[in-house]
Amino acid sequence: MANSAQARKRARQNISHRNRNMSLRSELRTAIKHVRKAIGSADKNTAQAAYQASVATIDSIADKGIIHKNKAARHKSRLSSAIKAMA
């Protein structure tokens, strides 16, 4: 239990930061799912558009430090490779 005023404030901040981080991680997973779904539909133009939208989301989340920049690069690379592999 947080006893000092400083510890109570940090506990409050940790809760709000955790909620924000969880929301952003969920947004990241949703963006990736949209691209995967577009790739599954076999429409390259739709997949490309979904990829462009997801790249902005992935980069913004990496810039905020929610995920590491290498993880962001890995997601973008794998999605891009999957789109390029489409017939």
Curated annotation (Swiss-Prot):
GO terms for molecular function: small ribosomal subunit rRNA binding; structural constituent of ribosome. GO terms for biological process: translation. The keyword Transport does not apply. Keywords: Ribonucleoprotein, Ribosomal protein, RNA-binding, rRNA-binding. It comes from the Bacteria. Residues 1-25 are annotated as: Disordered. Residues 7-20 have a biased composition (Basic residues). GO terms for cellular component: cytosol; small ribosomal subunit. Belongs to the bacterial ribosomal protein bS20 family. Binds directly to 16S ribosomal RNA. This is Small ribosomal subunit protein bS20. It comes from Nitrosospira multiformis (strain ATCC 25196 / NCIMB 11849 / C 71).
